[in-house]
Design a protein with these regions (language model features):
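Phosphodiester-processing cores and adjacent nucleic acid-binding clamps
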Residues: 1-139
Length: 139
């Protein structure tokens, strides 16, 4: 079984990623990875280019995003299908149009409304689960 990266940032995740979508595809191909996800912060800026380049390179692309959630947590979302892509687009639009914060942020209500076709990962070290566990909160 091959290793698959499900949480990858490109240079569209400012201060968090340095590679272009094309560079990510090139490295994945070099290492024989059959699948690769792109999960930039709060945006899908490189998603279409990434998808097209991955398919042309014989790599199965997974589109997603790492979003900022209320409570100052991160949540990584992957699109399972076109319904997931549509849900993620609607969620990101709602986040960017919301006046909840000085930066795009999702509320649980937004996620409840726009979740069809999405897969949620437990997240990076700034995810809700890792943060609560690091505080000793096991409930």
């Amino acid at each position: 079984m091959s290793f698959i990266h499900l949480h990858v940032h490109s240079y569209y995740s400012f201060h968090d990623g340095a590679a272009s979508p094309a560079g990510l595809i090139e490295k994945a191909k070099h290492f024989g990875m059959p699948v690769l996800a792109l999960t930039d912060h709060n945006r899908l800026t490189g998603a279409i280019r990434f998808y097209d380049l991955a398919e042309k390179s014989g790599i199965k692309p997974i589109i997603g995003a790492e979003i900022d959630m209320e409570g100052d947590y991160h949540l990584t979302l992957l699109c399972k299908d076109m319904a997931g892509y549509s849900s993620l687009c609607r969620l990101l639009t709602a986040m960017h149009c919301s006046k909840c914060s000085d930066r795009p942020m999702a509320t649980r209500d937004m996620l409840d409304r726009h979740h069809e076709g999405l897969i949620a990962l437990s997240g990076c070290r700034l995810g809700e689960i890792p943060t609560l566990l690091s505080r000793g909160d096991m409930d």
